[in-house]
Amino acid sequence: WEQPPADLLPILEANPDITVKNLNGLGFQTIMRPNTLNAPMDDVRIRNAAIAAVNQKDVLDALVGTPELYNICGAMFVCDTPLATDVGSETLTAGNGMEKAKALLAEAGYDGTPIVLMHPTDVASLRSQPVVVAQAMRDVGFVVDLQAMDWQTLVGKRASQASIADGGWHMFITNWVGADVFNPLVNNMVNGKGKDGGWFGWPDVPKVEELRTAYATSQSLDEQKKIAEEIQKIAYEEGMYAPIGQYFVPAAWSNTLEGVLDGPAPFFWNITKK
């Protein structure tokens, strides 16, 4: 079983015929992604207010529930990696950004426009976070339209650059395998190409693109660390996205299997059956 729900782990662990082990040391990153095209999320202050409102612990308690299986982590390139840094994430990881969020909303002149937050209800690892985030945003003054849908509908809807009046959206939440976000080249959320070549949400941040190119051509780890830190700093300032927690999902398999390998994704070689 690749990803058993956390509440079933005690049952699996109590079975002497089953091995339960975390194979993915990088874990998963759950993230919130704003749409920079649609007002009021086109205002960086509104995006940063939404991010500041969130408490990672609340999100992770709802999603995972077991503290041993999650980390409070604001590192866009994953905690406990060479590029991990806290730069820009101090309020997010402290979970004390409510007053900051309220101040940003006041400064931006937020007028109560409903924020369309898509809520996939059919995927266990994605249905809790939007509820927690929506309430956190409401607590600081946002009006949130939490739109329930299945994951496939969300995947289709998030690709649309349409206005809200034409069925567009403001924000969604998804999860990434750590290996898919652990440097600036593979992390889609720090793509700053905007409407032409950017990932869903489409932030247009040319400086980040310059830095990603510099990262790609750098041959020094120390230099890459500095570049990654600067990218993260700008990404937080621009409200490109926010990691809202790192979590781990132990796998479970029959003791009749041998040779199961650690890795960032399941490997189906080297396995034999007794």
Language-model features: where?
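Ligand-binding "clamshell"
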Residues: 9-22, 165-168, 182-197, 254-258
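Structural transition elements
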Residues: 68-107, 123-128
